[in-house]
Amino acid sequence: MKSDIEIAQSVPLKPITEIVKKVGIDGDDLELYGNYKAKLSFEKIKSVKGNKPGKLILVTAINPTPAGEGKSTMSIGLADALTKIGKKTMLALREPSLGPVMGIKGGAAGGGYAQVLPMEDINLHFTGDMHAITTAHNALSALIDNHLQQGNELGIDPRRIIWKRVLDLNDRSLRQVIVGLGSPVNGVPREDGFDITVASEVMAILCLATDLKDLKARLANIVIAYRYDKSPVYVRDLKVEGALALILKDAIKPNLVQTIYGTPAFVHGGPFANIAHGCNSVLATSTALRLADYTVTEAGFGADLGAEKFLNIKTPNLPKAPDAVVIVATLRALKMHGGVAKADLTFENTAAVRSGFANLKRHVENIRKFNIPVVVAINEFVTDTKAEIQVLKELCAEIAVPVELASVWAKGADGGIALANAVVSAIAEESAAYKRLYADKDSLEEKLRAIVTEIYGGRAVQFGPKAKNQLKQFAQFGWDQLPVCMAKTQYSFSDDPSLLGAPDQFDITIRELVPKTGAGFIVALTGDVMTMPGLPKTPAAMKMDVTEDGTAVGLF
């Protein structure tokens, strides 16, 4: 079998102007970035706003193994399979962060014969959105430090600035830094730090904004610091939201590319799901819904993180809720949740599949709490045995959830036809009646308790000393009406990554709350979740290269 990049480079690309005709987009509606990438114009986005939205399919997963469960690959393969069975389909995915591409992942545009193309461009600089977001974010940092230097008219306490700088790389050495050193002309010395760009509130705002006006309003509402009297300071107090929106005026436009099979795909925005809300842009998803009969989108990591945030944070900003949710599972992950060591996952173990099924079962039950039909997709691997597959199918039948094998990595669209038909049938047979997990009027404590007990299966939520004080403070500022965004390990329902399966006798401890008032949610930090990742001992970058003719090598 060829590598992902070898497969991607072997596929003859069609001009993007030809690809998008399938969903009623003309060449004049595009802002081209070469022949195979484009941004969609605001004029086209506005012109389809009155269209009735099509069906929305959300792809999520069980709690993943370190290698991931193939959610993006499955999303692409499902979209291609829907196209193959005659459905007018679009795909709406997140764009990769360069940090993990250079770090552990090596690439994030699908895999095998289920990829979005041009894969190398998407994984690297693409259309420059990440750079624009990084620039806007750091421009705000520079403007804050300049305000301190120029007299600090707003009375900002330099010790209480909560706006860090960002970089789209994994660089642990920048987590905590001191700025303003050297001499009085170099600024006011203070502690600072760097997050990865995909953890930036600017990224979250770009992905939740519905247009430029909304983008500017959300940027204005960012909390950047506290004064000496502990009152919050907003971007609007600095009067720079217009400048930030100007930097982002092109980045907010959704990017269009194609799959190997020729399905039109929006790839736009990329917040992480363990430290942010983990969904692609509202603009991309909403526009796809109004252009296609079926839109396939995904939410990061497992359903306890990405799907929960999609349904509680993103869905209220969309024209409709998902009509079906596909939960991707692998037998290797189920066996790991059933207690099998990583080194032994290739050996048949039906008992471990039965034990690990508790993890999948809880995810199915959780999605059903939102009143949305569920389909399970088994992402097939060559090490899967007939006995293991049969056990999993029997277990799914016991909880009355449709389940289909999918081999889109190896077979592309052909490997996802059974899954596509199952999803279409689920939508036709059972109408979604979306119900949110909590109400806006619920307190932050009530919202967090609902997520911990209803979604994670935990016993209770505990608050550290800092978080306890913040609960009172945020209520005084009126921020308790916002939804919550949990920053938690993706490997477990709990905040302990080693607690696999479906644990229940555990508490989740919230150590700190972070206001993201521009994005419109409050981040709750648990465990040791880092907002600036580090590189592994052997980074994927060590295998990457470029030939003399400019061909990328080693992007998996």
Swiss-Prot record:
Enzymatic class: ligase
EC number: 6.3.4.3
GO biological process: tetrahydrofolate interconversion
Disulfide bonds: none
Pathway assigned to this chain's UniProt record: One-carbon metabolism; tetrahydrofolate interconversion
Catalyses which reaction(s): (6S)-5,6,7,8-tetrahydrofolate + formate + ATP = (6R)-10-formyltetrahydrofolate + ADP + phosphate
Any coiled-coil regions, as ranges: none
Keywords, alphabetical: ATP-binding, Ligase, Nucleotide-binding, One-carbon metabolism
Keyword ATP-binding: yes
Record bears the keyword Nucleotide-binding: yes
A molecular function (GO) term: formate-tetrahydrofolate ligase activity
Entry superkingdom: Bacteria
Residues that, per the record, bind ATP: T65, P66, A67, G68, E69, G70, K71, S72
Gene3D superfamilies: Domain 2, N(10)-formyltetrahydrofolate synthetase, Formyltetrahydrofolate synthetase, domain 3, P-loop containing nucleotide triphosphate hydrolases
Record-stated family: Belongs to the formate--tetrahydrofolate ligase family.
Protein name: Formate--tetrahydrofolate ligase
Organism expressing this protein natively: Streptococcus equi subsp. zooepidemicus (strain H70)
